[in-house]
Amino acid sequence: MIFHEFGDKKFPHILLIHGGGNSWWNYLRQARMLSDKYHVILPTLDGHGEEYQKEYISTENSAHQIMDYIKNNCNGKLFAVGGVSLGGQIAIELLSLNNDIAQKAIIDGSICIPQPRLARVSTIIVKLFGKLMFSKYACKIQLSLMKKMFPNMAYPKEIEDYYMEDMPRTPIKTLVTIYQTYMGEYRLKYSIAESKAQVLYIYGEKEMGCVKESAKLFQKMHPNCTVYEAKGYNHGYLSVYLPLEWMDLVNPFLENDVHHNS
């Protein structure tokens, strides 16, 4: 696992974890905007990006690696932790491991209720079509379609370049393991109730039902949680494609005890 850092190390620490199949650049734009007030840390998970040759193991394994980094580099505590999809689940696991790890947490589009059937279907699809779906040609088509159909969500050139470099080299094995662990096995732990963090749990209005159910379960077990539904949006849109909207939502949450109504 590699850690990219932005801002002065003396600033409060914020760690943001990318989604499955993507890499640290998921949160690059947010990191730059936050770095005038915060020390922002963006990990590259094993099996992703420049760490594509390392085996991805599980949510729990990733959380333990990040916990070691926090102990060694941040005096064992963060101001805030966040993540999108798989990254959000890893953030949830960090909160479950240590009730004092962070004052704030931002979860976007993550599940914490096992979905074994969905995991099996996704695994079959990625085993059959993964090499085609993540080929350089397919990635180019995806980027050009994004520009034409959703110009407000298109990546800038810098992130397009990272996308074109990292997506085609993501091992199919990484994706299969993510579906099996993130989707098929991970269950919210009872220790989450002990977490002292104030949590903002975001999901898109058009997300799968299991994401919305996960947010409800999380809030039930950890009442210091505001659930925010991003109207008209699908999975992870604010974190991955709309950094300015993410900042508009998250900045007040970081700076105050402002609660957003869903």
Whereabouts are the PLM-identified features?
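Conserved HGGG/HGGXW glycine-rich cap/lid loop of the alpha/beta-hydrolase fold
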Residues: 5-52
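Active-site loop/oxyanion-hole signature of alpha/beta-hydrolase fold enzymes
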Residues: 41-82, 244
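Gly/Ala-rich beta-loop-alpha elbow adjacent to hydrolase catalytic centers
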Residues: 83-87, 91
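Flexible "cap/lid" loop of the alpha/beta hydrolase fold
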Residues: 96, 102-133
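Conserved alpha/beta-hydrolase catalytic His-Asp/Glu region
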Residues: 116-118, 136-191
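Short beta-strand/loop motif that positions the catalytic acidic residue
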Residues: 195, 201-203
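Conserved alpha/beta-hydrolase "acid-adjacent" motif
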Residues: 208-214
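Catalytic histidine-centered segment of alpha/beta-hydrolase-like enzymes
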Residues: 233-244
